[in-house]
Amino acid sequence: MPCSEDAAAVSASKRARAEDGASLRFVRLSEHATAPTRGSARAAGYDLFSAYDYTISPMEKAIVKTDIQIAVPSGCYGRVAPRSGLAVKHFIDVGAGVIDEDYRGNVGVVLFNFGKEKFEVKKGDRIAQLICERISYPDLEEVQTLDDTERGSGGFGSTGKN
C-alpha cells in the first residue's frame, strides 16, 4: 500500500514520539516565561529561555529563572546542557544540570561566567538546552569486592594521551 504524502511528510521525531507516547509537558508560571523550543526537527534539546534580566560578573554565577515547570516523560530525567554558542563566544557554562522526573519547581539554570567581562542576560534570551534522557533506577548493593577489569583503577589520562 503506497504512503500518502501526509504520512511521508511526518518527521522522524514525530514518529518516534508517537511510538513511545513520550511528551515533555510544561506550565508557564508567569507572563515572563517563554515556551521551550527546538532549533531544528532533529535537535537533541529544547532551548530554555530566561524570564528576567541578569548581569553575571566575571568568574561569578547566577541562577537564571525560566518561569516554567516541566514534567519529563516517565523513565527520563532532564539534562540541562550548555548552548555551544554561549560557551564559544562568551565563556558561559551551565552547572548542576539535572531535573529529576519528580521535580515540579521553577526551572532555574546555573550559569557560570568564565569570561573576563560581565555577561548580560536579557529576558527572552536562550540560555541553555534541555535534553530528555532515559534513566535506570538500579538497586544499591554493597559487596566485598568488585570484578577485575583490564583497565582496573587507572583514570585521569591512563588510557592514553589523546
UniProtKB/Swiss-Prot annotation:
Disulfide cross-links: none
Cofactors: Mg(2+)
UniProt-annotated binding residues for dUTP: 83-85, 97-103, 108, 151, 156-157
Gene Ontology process terms (BP): dTMP biosynthetic process; dUMP biosynthetic process; dUTP catabolic process
Keywords: Hydrolase, Magnesium, Metal-binding, Nucleotide metabolism, Nucleus, Phosphoprotein, Transit peptide
One MF term in the entry's GO annotations: dUTP diphosphatase activity
Class of the enzyme per the UniProt entry, highest EC level: hydrolase
Post-translational modification: Phosphorylated in vivo on Ser-11, a reaction that can be catalyzed in vitro by CDC2.
Catalytic activity: dUTP + H2O = dUMP + diphosphate + H(+)
Phenotype of gene-disrupted mutants: Embryos reach the blastocyst stage, however, they die shortly after implantation and analysis of pre-implantation embryos indicates perturbed growth of both inner cell mass and trophectoderm.
PANTHER family: DEOXYURIDINE 5'-TRIPHOSPHATE NUCLEOTIDOHYDROLASE
Protein family membership: Belongs to the dUTPase family.
Protein name: Deoxyuridine 5'-triphosphate nucleotidohydrolase
Origin species: Mus musculus (Mouse)
